[in-house]
Amino acid sequence: MSCVTRAPMSVPQTALQPNSYVNFDAQQTSSTLLPVEVIDSVMQYLPAHDVIQSSFASYPLTLIANKIIRARLSFLDEYSLRVFAKDVYTDSPICNLSARRGLYSLQYDGYSVFHLDPNNCSSIFQISFEDDEDLASFERYPGEFLAPHINVRIHVTLSRSSCDRHQADIFSCFQDPIRVRRDWLDSIKPGQPETLWFDQNTQHVIGLIVTRVDAAPGKYDLSVTSVIVQTEYLLSCLEKRVH
């Protein structure tokens, strides 16, 4: 992974004068404005959404926190989230797609939504198997066998193309095998969106929004519409990468 220069993610110091107030939304003149010291603190210690909500309940902080977070993430508009997956055993590709950050969506509150690039070569996450022997058995504890699944290795990176067309990665969001259960695949109804979480049964920080487009036995073609990443996780990864 190549090193990149940190993108500016803070409010210019010339805009912050001692004992002054910053109006983040001129149209909301009735809203109480935050002291610049609080704004500096939030800018320095993101993610701070929960902290400022509990500590300064008298201010319209949800609005201001969201504005600050969106400002910190705005530079990502130049980047793509690239997702590559392959079957662990057959080594065959399952998906290869890229997505760009879209507008904030109330439907996925707390997540940054990356919509597939219009020029993306494929939007399909394809899993297939011939019979049960193609599915891996998994025993978490002695005598406890979990539902049949397919082992898939997912690699997600946040990167952009430089002028010489080389990829400049900010960081790898995820690079681990996941177990895709057959019963979960069978439960997906065509045309109904579902979320395929990469960190199943944990915190749900990265996932694909998918719909099933093929109901043939042993074949699952999932159409990917977007990738969602927990905003707090994304900010945390960025802070670790640039410091």
Curated annotation (Swiss-Prot):
Pathway connected to this protein: Protein modification; protein ubiquitination
One GO cellular component term: ubiquitin ligase complex
GO BP terms: protein ubiquitination
Domain of life of the organism encoding this protein: Eukaryota
This protein's UniProt keywords: Ubl conjugation pathway
Domain F-box: 28-73
Function: Probable substrate recognition component of a SCF (SKP1-CUL1-F-box protein) E3 ubiquitin-protein ligase complex that mediates the ubiquitination and subsequent proteasomal degradation of target proteins.
The protein, known as: F-box protein pof15
